[in-house]
């Protein structure tokens, strides 16, 4: 019996895949547990429609990420964070992902999830540093972060 998988089934098939499976297995397990349905013309067109919608949504997300990358990589987009500095020139504390995200929102109105900022070590020195931001799996932007004395 030909079925269209509605969810991933280990060892059988992935979501949206059309596959020939034993009739008993299809009727008693896959269809009963709503993991698959019989591959009729209506079911096939529904799966194709879902695939097109998912593809369109993915393209929109990619375009949005590319537009945000353009904004973040402009020369005038420099995130400035002020820190207290001791007499020896060392900073008190460090700048982390959350601080950068908060500064982006307050200075440029860009709401960015701190988990997308790819900062390996906290910034503890004065100066300018390029910080990578992963906006999409295919799009990574570099943000300039300037740490200055308060």
Curated annotation (Swiss-Prot):
The keyword Repeat does not apply. SUPFAM superfamilies: L9 N-domain-like (SSF55658), Ribosomal protein L9 C-domain (SSF55653). The keyword rRNA-binding applies. GO terms for cellular component: ribonucleoprotein complex; ribosome. Keywords: Ribonucleoprotein, Ribosomal protein, RNA-binding, rRNA-binding. InterPro entries: Ribosomal_bL9 (IPR000244), Ribosomal_bL9/RNase_H1_N (IPR009027), Ribosomal_bL9_bac/chp (IPR020594), Ribosomal_bL9_C (IPR020069), Ribosomal_bL9_C_sf (IPR036791), Ribosomal_bL9_N (IPR020070), Ribosomal_bL9_N_sf (IPR036935). GO terms for molecular function: rRNA binding; structural constituent of ribosome. One of its GO terms (biological process) is translation. Binds to the 23S rRNA. HAMAP family: Ribosomal_bL9 (MF_00503). Belongs to the bacterial ribosomal protein bL9 family. This is Large ribosomal subunit protein bL9. It comes from Lactococcus lactis subsp. cremoris (strain SK11).
């Amino acid at each position: 019996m030909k079925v269209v998988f509605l969810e991933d089934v280990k060892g059988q098939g992935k979501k949206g895949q059309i596959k020939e499976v034993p009739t008993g297995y299809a009727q008693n397990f896959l269809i009963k547990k709503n993991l698959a349905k019989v591959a009729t013309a209506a079911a096939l067109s529904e799966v194709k429609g879902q695939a097109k919608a998912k593809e369109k949504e993915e393209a929109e997300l990619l375009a949005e990420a590319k537009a945000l990358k353009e904004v973040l990589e402009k020369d005038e987009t420099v995130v400035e964070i002020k820190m207290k500095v001791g007499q020896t020139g060392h900073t008190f504390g460090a700048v982390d992902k959350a601080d950068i995200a908060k500064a982006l929102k307050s200075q440029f109105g860009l709401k960015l999830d701190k988990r997308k900022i790819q900062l390996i070590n906290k910034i503890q020195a004065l100066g300018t540093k390029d910080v990578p931001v992963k906006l999409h799996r295919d799009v990574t932007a570099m943000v300039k972060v300037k740490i200055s004395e308060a």
